[in-house]
Amino acid sequence: MSFKMTQNQYTSLYGPTVGDSIRLGDTNLFAQIEKDYAVYGEEATFGGGKSIRDGMAQNPRVTRDDVNVADLVISNAVIIDYDKVVKADIGIKNGYIFAIGNAGNPDIMDNVDIIIGSTTDIIAAEGKIVTAGGIDTHVHFINPEQAEVALESGITTHIGGGTGASEGSKATTVTPGPWHIHRMLEAAEGLPINVGFTGKGQATNPTALIEQINAGAIGLKVHEDWGATPSALSHALDVADEFDVQIALHADTLNEAGFMEDTMAAVKDRVLHMYHTEGAGGGHAPDLIKSAAFSNILPSSTNPTLPYTHNTVDEHLDMVMITHHLNAAIPEDIAFADSRIRKETIAAEDVLQDMGVFSMISSDSQAMGRVGEVITRTWQVAHRMKEQRGPLDGDFEHNDNNRIKRYIAKYTINPAITHGISEYVGSIEPGKLADIVLWDPIFFGVKPELVVKGGLINSAVNGDANGSIPTSEPMKYRKMYGQYGGNLTSTSMTFVSKTAYENGINRALNLKRMVRPVKNIRQLSKADMKNNSATPKLDVDPQTYEVYVDGEKITSNAATELPLTQRYFLF
């Protein structure tokens, strides 16, 4: 005999199901469940009187040797990813996702993809949202504490360069030369996130570039503070093509060695990652933004200009002066800073993100950007654009799935593809490292509930260790066992070039972390950017700095109020 319950009763027990919508934080965005993998009436839930007990949803006879027996099941989660908004159980084994589907005991339950046995732990995600760990591809490695701050925001991978609080690191995402690269690879052993380092891309002698790739750099950064000349860029791209690594470009703001057209002529048709493509973070003034129309350019934004608010322009001048070691007593330095801050191109940036013309969002950590705000600012932009531009095509009331998939791709799968690590991270898919972020919908985009790193809980909101229950105040982020002992190295990856990997860089430096090679980079094009591959004609008026897409002027209004702000940071 079947049992009937109301939709509210079902949701309170098992979370939302097909057709239900979840509001993301206090934004105007709603995610609607497209598919539910559960068999109604056979949902696996943990707790007193619940179904995950011996002989019920937990199989009493299987052992861990069975490939379908999970080490960890995240039950009844709403998965938001670049290609799906679904309700499912997630099976994790040996630190990797092995299945997305229905968990339980196949002896008594139908359509079981993931077996729960006596060796299985449970994270109850009923009513919660799960996303892939975020990837920040514009990190200045200035301060190792950035890793913890980012982790507590939902970011699990950092890509960039630096050696600490040097002037070179403060201004440029560069880890220069084999000695520094090796020291940073060793330092990464103590970080609770995945990392990859970019070397310095300025040299006419290819040997000076190749030795950095051989040392383990996953790519090269060409930055104007070291000289972003067409010659330097072309030489760096030659080496990148040979070794299948990425080039990240911070182009020539002052147009000293050439204009945007000269840079693109040096690039030819070769792929590169264009940093802060709007230009406030640096790059050809005033028209770097036009590069996003090229099919070989993978464009990203950094978060200080996102979203456009009434404070954005005012705060940027001082940031530029400090970050790039400029002197306020020198008129030319002031002019340099002023040339980068253009409210018209900043106002267009949000719209280009919403149209899928810009493909990624990153931080520019401590070098104008905020390492813990990539995810928050991404969703603030999505909110603002829905507010100003209305629903995207295919979206409707209480269903913003197309916009949600577009925006989540900007800090998950697209950065992973761009830097050749999408085989390992960037989405909730079988075969990938279990870097997973769990959110209470109320706090989505601001404060995760916990972070699973390589299959083990790495960081979580938890109470006083002397409390009688785990929610005793003060509730705050605390390091979990994933950050202790050998787990620090067994749950995170260090990414290196293929040549360094094949030559045994892990053995040469006695690295304990999982070392993996980047791959499949040089054949990329913008068409590979998920949900963010638009290449319209872009123009910038050289006098007014107004931006045009296919001949139509685009802009946005400066926000005076945003979601995901003060109400979440009272304590």
Curated annotation (Swiss-Prot):
| Binding residues for Ni(2+) 2 | K221, H250, H276
Spell out the protein name for this chain: Urease subunit alpha
- Please provide the Gene Ontology terms (biological process) for this protein: urea catabolic process
Q: Where is the Urease domain?
A: 133-571
Describe the PTM: Carboxylation allows a single lysine to coordinate two nickel ions.
Q: Which PANTHER family match?
A: UREASE (PTHR43440:SF1)
The primary gene name is: ureC
Cellular location(s): Cytoplasm
Binding positions for Ni(2+) 1?
H138, H140, K221, D364
Subunit-structure text: Heterotrimer of UreA (gamma), UreB (beta) and UreC (alpha) subunits. Three heterotrimers associate to form the active enzyme.
| Organism for this UniProt entry | Staphylococcus aureus (strain NCTC 8325 / PS 47)
Family to which this protein belongs:
Belongs to the metallo-dependent hydrolases superfamily. Urease alpha subunit family.
